[in-house]
Amino acid sequence: MACPWKFLFKAKSSRFDLTEEKDINNNLEKLRQASSSPVTQDDPKCPSRSRHRNECSQPLAETAKKSPDSLVKLDVLPPACPRHVRIKNWGSGMTFQDTLHREAKGDLACKSKSCLGAIMNPKSLTIGPRDKPTPPDELLPQAIEFVNLYYSSFKEAKIEEHLARVEAVTKEIETTGTYQLTGDELIFAAKQAWRNAPRCIGRIQWSNLQVFDARSCSTAQEMFEHICRHLRYATNNGNIRSAITVFPQRSDGKHDFRVWNAQLIRYAGYQMPDGTIIGDPASVEFTQLCIDLGWKPKYGRFDVVPLVLQADGRDPELFEIPPDLVLEVPMEHPKYEWFQELELKWYALPAVANMLLEVGGLEFPGCPFNGWYMGTEIGVRDFCDVQRYNILEEVGRRMGLETHKLASLWKDRAVVEINVAVLHSFQKQNVTIMDHHSAAESFMKYMQNEYRSRGGCPADWIWLVPPISGSITPVFHQEMLNYVLSPFYYYQVEAWKTHVWQDEKRRPRRKEIRFKVLVKAVLFAAVLMHKTMAARVRATILFATETGRSETLARDLGALFSCAFNPKVLCMDEYRLSRLEEEQLLLVVTSTFGNGGSPGNGEKLKKSLFMLKELTNKFRYAVFGLGSSMYPQFCAFAHDVDQKLSHLGASQLTPTGEGDELSGQEEAFRGWAVQTFKVACETFDVRGKHHIQIPKLYTSNVTWDPQLYRLVQDSEPLDLNKALSSMHAKYVFSMRLKSQQNLQSPQSSRTTLLVELCCEGSQGPSYLPGEHLGVFPANQPALVQGILERVVDGPAPHQPVRLETLSENGSYWVKDKRLPPCSLSQALTYFLDITTPPTQLLLRKLAQLATDEAERQRLETLCQPSDYNKWKFTNSPTFLEVLEEFPSLRVSASFLLSQLPILKPRYYSISSSRDRTPTEIHLTVAVLTYRTRDGQGPLHHGVCSTWLSSLKPQDLVPCFVRSASGFQLPEDPSRPCILIGPGTGIAPFRSFWQQRLHEAEHKGLQGGRMTLVFGCRRPDEDHLYQEEMLEMARKGVLHEVHTAYSRLPGQPKVYVQDLLRQRLAGEVLRVLHEEQGHLYVCGDVRMARDVACTLKQLVATALTLNEEQVEDYFFQLKSQKRYHEDIFGAVFPYEVKKEGAVGPPSDPRAPGAHGKS
């Protein structure tokens, strides 16, 4: 018989470090030897290592001397003090000395030159299948080591029982080749394995694990019954209890008992023919396996997959889990009622089912176990991971967050609220759950206990730090040592990948390709693609954007050019200008910001490019610009880039494209992109250029197919704010109209309103002076009614309906996400833009609906750019006017709901201070009316300004606050300011002076000099806020007020830039150059351009700067955020000559009235 004693007395120095250990069976703590206490403070006064080494006892050496030579191996290392690794908490300064790691089993995933610590399932933590038993000479030492560990856990030594058990195990292994654990040993092993699990944050409960011994079962049916008992015990009506069920151990690897599911309870994931996924994407492969094995799918988002159980190595069997054993929690939010509309839920019991318990050389491949949830497991990983349910953006939109702007931190705000909903929902249903902060605190306590009781605590920092909150949890600051002890829970290879099928007819045929063959095929394809791409012409695609639109189009362009070129898409601020000397093809997609400038992420490249004098590499290029034709500097930056590249010697591939957000921007981009692609293929002689299949994105949506849409009756009442919040990704709330006051005199032909909005309650929405209010208007009832009268085969105007679209494969209908369920009348009133002239693409689709051949041909002619632009700028027709011009059009309700553009909000600078009127928001609104056809056409009205002017007190106004971080009062209130705002450009400055007045009256703060430069036509006609300005001057809030009048009888026209030149040159220099003050400009783009030119002239003259130097000077002012512009587009692309016909900006086509559009 093999001698067990050499293993019994095997050197384990760390075990002798403890004079007393924790009793695993009664959970009592014993004291460690004082001289080797592993918990210390990080203090330079601590004893040195050499001193500590001299004080260490040597019990191992004494044991060796007293033992007979026949019972112990003497070739052990010389007695020495235990080596330790010092672990520090950088938050508290406390340190631990880890000695337990010396008992680690094998190596982890790290290599000498690289760390694999962030690999999900490293080989060191995975045990694969076996095809033969573990050899006795390998099993025996592991078995004896476990028996030693087990008996060392008792408070009082049981030497005789210990020695007897060692001898019995040794004999059993010698006789049978394996051994069986006793019931108590199994309980101890399962608990100890949880205690040793480095990736688990909830181990403080390890000793309370309930162990169900199912080693006697022999069939899959018995396995199912044991699992049902487990689920019933663990769920406990929501008061979750931790438990494990252990099935028979592995013998020769051919008779394994395994649960094929990753978790006992998990939701299915269905891969649909069009590539979309219904349910949990993480379960797609396993769900398909269940279907192949005979399960009938239900195609719901939250269908519980059946259990797939394998007994004694036989083929698996399916078992549906009884619904009464699956406790589910519906999700709701304590604040957001709409959260329930997401129809989310989650199961209460997290039970891992596919891991393997290793103990003493034995392997238990079937051992499902559970704890309870930490909230972030559901709220972050299950709901928000992009490869899971991925609800983050939808929640962000419903919250009204700026989901197009990463810097707004919308993801952080949304994920917190999702986690609030998860915790709230579980707690409301009295289901056990733990928040991540409490879990982190409990782990820190557990870790301290472990270092005191056994000198170490294996921990994987990457897994233990929660997926949100990071450094505000204590575990973030804790250094950790990761190692594998025994007993241990290991990962396994998925059972269906290694199972040897006995009945080949039941074997799923879907995955016939062997893994190695698949890897080789993928590798070969990757190498082939790399070589193919490397042989292609390189194309660099640059974008600059403020809203993200240019980036989206640039990436679409990259997808198109990847069909024949080797494209790379970069933001301008990521591009090194030196690469121009290496380019073959350069494509640029950019918007224009402010008064003809570049977006913020294009400033750096613009400055470098425009300073470049020569270029030796004569590459090809093409540019596409995005903008709004209401601005005089329409697409100016794109044209500037085009001209500069041309001057440097680069060769233009196609003319610069222009995408007008008021006129079919997307269609213009598609046409330019396809044309540029074709010319590039010809220019670079791309092989097979006439047979390249371009992406569907560039070929679809050019015709109207009524078979792809249908209307379904719906009974859900419309919540306007909720619908607008979801559609526009804004937090929309309603305010009531308090009052309106016309700020212009009765003699004026125009109207400018002071609109005062109020909210119920003691506190209104949060905003800062200078920020904008976005207002969602309603279309005029006459326009809506006129369109409704011309709809064919439509539902009743007030019948709620929802629009559904047919899937690409035509097999099912999908709810359209563009519009909420509503009546046709509501859609035309609140959601659809019926005043903007139809785009060319919309006219092309309308041509299909014309029953008169002449009208059809006329509509097709209008799709041509030259005819279209002339027709559009002359008539600027509303959609009703189009229907009147082409009376044979047969327009359906589904056409209107699917093809008309979305009505955009209008932005107004807030004209009040929240500190002064906390429950109110004031707006300065110019009511717009104009006639087309050089003043001879029909009268048109501004959508929002006309709607606001028609409201009665207490009427509701849906709105939201938009931040304007670049247009706010100085952080240092002592800095002097110059405010320049003619006409309605005065709007934000009223909020400035009201804020300064409040600070002076209630806080005793006296702000720096504030000079106002205002402009209007005549003092007795349109001098807005004249009395209030004078009052502010009397109270010292405004240091000086200068007004330019442009229509005084018998006097020359004077504008604000004239006042700057004539009266304020010295003040401008003092404020900007000497006192580091701020200058603000608010108004239309032409005024802003003229003011900027005047200021540059003044500065250049005073400081003797050339043109390049003065441009750099103002670039620095903007970089320092001391030159502020709030520009709106009050200029039409066509000129209306009649005096007073064109009013200030509340243009029905303008996305911004007093803000940047």
From Swiss-Prot:
Polyubiquitinated; mediated by SPSB1, SPSB2 and SPSB4, leading to proteasomal degradation. FMN binds at T545, E546, T547, R549, S550, S591, T592, S628, C635, E661, Q665. Pfam families: FAD_binding_1, Flavodoxin_1, NAD_binding_1, NO_synthase. Induction: Little by LPS or ConA in spleen cells. NADP(+) binds at R750, T929, T984, R1017, S1046, R1047, K1053, Y1055, Q1057, D1090. (6R)-L-erythro-5,6,7,8-tetrahydrobiopterin binds at R381, I462, W463, F476. Detected in both stimulated and unstimulated immune cells and macrophages with little or no up-regulation following cellular stimulation with lipopolysaccharides (LPS) or concanavalin A (ConA). It is an enzyme of class 1 (oxidoreductase). Gene3D superfamilies: 3.40.50.360, NADPH-cytochrome p450 Reductase, Chain A, domain 3, Nitric Oxide Synthase, Chain A, domain 1, Nitric Oxide Synthase, Chain A, domain 3, Nitric Oxide Synthase,Heme Domain,Chain A domain 2, Nucleotide-binding domain of ferredoxin-NADP reductase (FNR) module, Translation factors. It is found in: Cytoplasm, Cytosol. The gene is NOS2. It comes from Sus scrofa. Heme b binds at C200, Y491. A motif (DINNN-motif) lies at residues 23-27. Its cofactor is heme b; FAD; FMN; (6R)-L-erythro-5,6,7,8-tetrahydrobiopterin. CDD domains: NOS_oxygenase_euk. This is Nitric oxide synthase, inducible.
